[in-house]
UniProtKB/Swiss-Prot annotation:
First and last residue of the signal peptide: none
Protein name (record): Bifunctional protein HldE
Region (Ribokinase): 1-318
InterPro entries documented for this protein: Bifunc_HldE, Carboh/pur_kinase_PfkB_CS, Cyt_trans-like, PfkB_dom, RfaE_dom_I, RfaE_dom_II, Ribokinase-like, Rossmann-like_a/b/a_fold
Region (Cytidylyltransferase): 344-476
Length: 476
C-alpha cells in the first residue's frame, strides 16, 4: 500500500509538563556486601535518558517535527545533562530554573537485567510561580500547531486550566496525557489520552467495548473535551468523539518487550500529526502504528519516520524493503543501536532464480539484518551488455524486497558498490562466486572498520545467463 506520512517537517509542537532525567547504572554483581545483606554492583555502564515530558518532546523531534519543551528544573548537573541530551536531538529547551529545587531525577541500579533499586531525587514543584511558564506558552502559540501537556503530578502543571485557556483562545489544540482521577482539572482540553486503567479509575470497571464507549462519551460531555483516546494495551486504542461513531484500532505490535514510554510516543505522534495538518483520525492511525513499534524496544524509545512508514505498511520494524541511501543509513544506525549484526551483499539480480534465493537465505543467516545493493539499469548495461537488464531496476528491487531473507534493498549507479559500502560499513560483507575476499569491492573499507568479508558459493546449475539462453533457444 502507498503510505504518505504527515509533513512532520512543517509541524511545530510545544510540550509543557514534568521533565525528569532517568539515570541507569549497570554492572555485574558477584558477591554480597560485608556491611549489609545487599549485593555489590560493580558499575561499568552509565546511561542518561530524558524522561517524562522530555521523552514526549524527544519523540516529536525524532519524527522531524519542530519540538519545544517547557518545564521546571533545578540549577544542577541533571538540568545541564537534560539540556545537552535534548539539544543533540533537536529539542529546543526553554526551562524555568528553580534554584530551591533539584531537577527530578530517577536513578536505577541494574544487574543481570534486574533492577535492584531505584532512587528518586525530587521535591514537588507545587507552589512555584507559574507565570514564567504561561509567558513561554503565550509567546509560542503563534508558531505551533499543537500544545501537549504532559502530567506526571510533579507540580509543573499546577495551573493547567490557565494553560488550556491560553491555547483555546489562540485556536491551538491541547492534548493531555493525564495523571490521577481528577479529570475536572483538564476541562476544555481538545484530547485526553488515558490508558485503560486511568480511564476505569474515573469511569469505573468496563465489561466490554460498549461500556467503554458509553462511559467515555459521558466523560467527554461532563468535562467539555473534544475527544477522548483510550489506549488499551494489547486491545489497541479507542477514539471517541461527539457525534461520530467510535473508532476502534487493533494493536499493531508484533512483539512486546517493554511498554515503558509508549504513552509518550502515542501523544507525541498524535500532536506532530495534528500540527502537520492531518485529521484526528489520521493522527490516531499513525500513533497506533508507532505504539506497535516502540513496545518492541527496550526502555523508553522513540520512533523514526522510516520505522513509522514501514509500520503502517504492515511491517512494524525498523525499515524494511526498498530504500534510498539516506534512509538506509538511518535504519542501519538504529539496528546497530539495538546490537544487531548487519550483513551486506550486492549484485544485478536480473532474473531471480533458486540460486539467488538460496544464496540470500544463507547470507541472512550470518547476521540479524541483510542489505542487498542492486546495480542500476545503466550500471547493469555497462557490466552485462546492451541487452541487459531484462527486468528494470524498480521491478528487481521490489522482488528482492519481498523475500523473507532480505531486510533492505538499495540501488547504486556506479560500476561497483564500493562508495555505497564505504558509507554503510556493514559488519559483514558477503559476495557469491569464486572471488578472493581481497578482490571484493568495499572489502578494504569494511576490514579497516573492524568488519569481516566472506565468500559464499552459488548453487550449481543456476544462472541468469543460462535462463536467458534457454528462453532464446526455446523461442526459436
Amino acid at each position: 500500500m502507498k503510505v504518505t506520512l504527515p509533513e512532520f517537517e512543517r509541524a511545530g509542537v510545544m510540550v509543557v509538563g514534568d521533565v525528569m532525567l532517568d539515570r541507569y547504572w549497570y554492572g555485574p554483581t558477584s558477591r554480597i556486601s560485608p556491611e549489609a545483606p545487599v549485593p555489590v554492583v560493580k558499575v561499568d555502564t552509565i546511561e542518561e535518558r530524558p524522561g517524562g515530558a522530555a521523552n514526549v518532546a524527544m519523540n516529536i523531534a525524532s519524527l522531524g517535527a519542530h519540538s519545544r519543551l517547557v518545564g521546571l528544573t533545578g540549577i544542577d548537573d541533571a538540568a545541564r545533562a537534560l539540556s545537552k541530551t535534548l539539544a543533540d536531538v533537536n529539542v529546543k529547551c526553554d526551562f524555568v530554573s528553580v534554584p530551591t529545587h533539584p531537577t527530578i531525577t530517577k536513578l536505577r541500579v541494574l544487574s543481570r537485567n534486574q533492577q535492584l533499586i531505584r532512587l528518586d531525587f525530587e521535591e514537588g514543584f507545587e507552589g512555584v510561580d507559574p507565570e514564567p511558564m504561561h509567558e513561554r506558552i503565550a509567546q509560542a502559540l503563534g508558531s505551533i500547531g499543537a500544545l501537549v501537556l504532559s502530567d506526571y503530578a510533579k507540580g509543573a502543571l499546577a495551573s493547567v486550566q490557565q494553560m488550556i485557556q491560553l491555547a483555546r483562545k489562540a485556536g491551538v489544540p491541547v492534548l493531555i496525557d493525564p495523571k490521577g482521577t481528577e479529570f475536572e482539572r483538564y476541562r476544555g482540553a481538545t484530547l485526553l489520552t488515558p490508558n485503560l486503567s486511568e480511564f476505569e479509575a474515573v469511569a469505573g470497571k468496563c465489561k466490554n467495548e460498549e461500556e467503554i464507549v458509553e462511559r467515555g462519551m459521558k466523560i467527554i460531555a461532563d468535562f467539555d473535551f473534544s475527544a477522548l483516546l483510550v489506549t488499551r494495551s494489547e486491545q489497541g486504542m479507542t477514539l471517541l468523539q461527539p457525534g461520530k461513531p467510535p473508532l476502534h484500532m487493533p494493536t499493531q505490535a508484533q512483539e512486546v518487550y517493554d511498554v515503558t514510554g509508549a504513552g509518550d510516543t502515542v501523544i507525541g505522534v498524535l500532536a506532530a500529526t495534528l500540527a502537520a495538518g492531518n485529521s484526528l483520525e489520521e493522527a490516531c492511525y499513525f500513533a497506533n502504528a508507532a505504539a506497535g513499534v516502540v513496545v518492541g524496544k527496550l526502555g523508553t524509545s522513540t520512533v523514526s519516520p522510516i520505522e513509522l512508514e514501514n509500520a503502517v505498511r504492515g511491517r512494524a520494524d525498523t525499515g524494511f524493503g526498498v530504500m534510498r541511501e539516506d534512509e538506509l543509513k538511518v535504519a542501519v544506525a538504529a539496528a546497530r543501536k539495538r546490537g544487531e549484526k548487519v550483513v551486506m551483499t550486492n549484485g544485478v539480480f536480473d532474473i531471480l532464480h533458486a540460486g539467488h534465493v538460496s544464496y540470500l537465505a544463507n547470507a541472512r543467516k550470518l547476521g540479524d539484518r541483510l542489505i542487498v545493493a542492486v546495480n542500476s539499469d545503466a550500471s547493469t548495461k555497462r557490466l552485462k551488455g546492451e541487452t541487459r537488464p531484462v527486468n528494470p531496476l524498480e521491478q528487481r528491487m521490489i522482488v528482492l524486497g519481498a523475500l523473507e531473507a532480505v531486510d533492505w534493498v538499495v540501488s547504486f549507479e556506479e560500476d561497483t558498490p564500493q562508495r555505497l559500502i564505504a558509507g554503510i560499513l556493514p559488519d559483514l560483507l558477503v559476495k557469491g562466486g569464486d572471488y578472493k575476499p581481497e578482490q571484493i569491492a568495499g572489502s578494504e573499507e569494511v576490514w579497516a572498520n573492524g568488519g569481516d568479508v566472506m565468500v559464499l558459493n552459488f548453487e550449481d546449475g543456476c544462472s541468469t545467463t543460462n535462463i536467458i539462453k534457454k528462453i532464446q533457444k526455446d523461442s526459436q
